[in-house]
Regions:
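Anionic-ligand binding patches
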Residues: 9-163
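A short beta-strand-loop structural module common to alpha/beta enzyme folds
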Residues: 1-4
Length: 163
C-alpha cells in the first residue's frame, strides 16, 4: 500500500505500528470489494524506546546493528484484518537478543544488501539468523507476519484455516 509509514517518536511504538498497519489495510480496501478480506502488517524494532524502521542508508544499517549488538530488543508487528467494513488490529511482540557482533560481521552483512529493506536492519530468516542468541515469543512476528495470530483473527471472522 502506498502510505506514509513515518512514525511519531513521541507516541508509544505499539500505537504507531498498529496505526500504520491499519492505514495499509484501508489504503488497499479502496480498490477491493467490501466482502474481500484484506490482511496487512507492519513491523518495527524497538530498543531503549527508540523505533528502528528500515535503514535509510548503509551507514544507518551499520548504526542500527551496532545498537542491537549484544543487547535485547523487541520486535512489534501490527497485524490488521479488514472485511465487510470491520477492521481488527492486534500488535504481536517478540523479544530478541543478539550476541555481540564484530565490526567485520556487521560490514559483511550490510554489504550483502539484505538488511536494507528490513526493520532494524536485519532479517531473522536470512544471514542475520546467526546473530540471534535468544528469542522470546513468535518467530513469525519477527519475520513480519505472525501467522498464529492471523489464523485466530481469521477464525473469528468465520474463515476456516486448515480444517
Amino acid at each position: 500500500a502506498d502510505i506514509d509509514e513515518h512514525m511519531d517518536p513521541s507516541l508509544p511504538p505499539e500505537q504507531e505500528v498498529a496505526r500504520v498497519s491499519a492505514e495499509k489495510a484501508r489504503a488497499v480496501a479502496k480498490d477491493c470489494a467490501e466482502e474481500d478480506i484484506i490482511i496487512s502488517a507492519d513491523t518495527i524494532v524497538v530498543i531503549d524506546g527508540q523505533i528502528l524502521g528500515k535503514p535509510k542508508s548503509e551507514a544507518d544499517a551499520i548504526r542500527m546493528l551496532n545498537l542491537l549488538s549484544g543487547r535485547r530488543h523487541e520486535v512489534m508487528t501490527g497485524l490488521t484484518v479488514l472485511s465487510g467494513g470491520q477492521s481488527q488490529t492486534q500488535v504481536v511482540r517478540t523479544g530478541i537478543e543478539f550476541r555481540r557482533l564484530t565490526d567485520r560481521e556487521i560490514d559483511a552483512y550490510v554489504a550483502t544488501g539484505e538488511p536494507m529493506d528490513k526493520a532494524g536492519a536485519y532479517g531473522i530468516q536470512g544471514r542475520a539468523s546467526i546473530f540471534v542468541s535468544h528469542l522470546d515469543g513468535d518467530y513469525f512476528c519477527v519475520m513480519g507476519l505472525p501467522v498464529c495470530t492471523l489464523t485466530q483473527m481469521l477464525r473469528e471472522r468465520g474463515v476456516t484455516v486448515l480444517g
